[in-house]
Amino acid sequence: MPKTFYEFLMTQRNPESYEPVASFANNAFLDSAFPKQETQFEPLSKYLEENAPYLPSMTIFDDAWQLYLAALA
């Protein structure tokens, strides 16, 4: 089973960083409803668009997704 996006994102956490992906990871950690078992782009994108006011731009998710895909390769 591939690593979930959430598991990958947690490797990007850094409470001391203002880097966008790190900030996204820090906030996703605090989001109790985040789809932690998801590995597919569309359901994650839909969730974030509808439920993640902490994500100022979907471009940040796109960047994190590309990092996730690279980590799986």
Curated annotation (Swiss-Prot):
Xref: SUPFAM superfamilies: YozE-like
- InterPro entries (UniProt xref): UPF0346, YozE_SAM-like, YozE_SAM-like_sf
- Read off the Gene3D superfamilies from this record: YozE SAM-like
Annotated transmembrane regions: none
| Top-rank lineage group of the source organism | Bacteria
UniProt family annotation: Belongs to the UPF0346 family.
* NCBIfam families referenced in this protein's UniProt entry, alphabetically: PRK13672.1
What is the name of this protein?
UPF0346 protein LVIS_0790
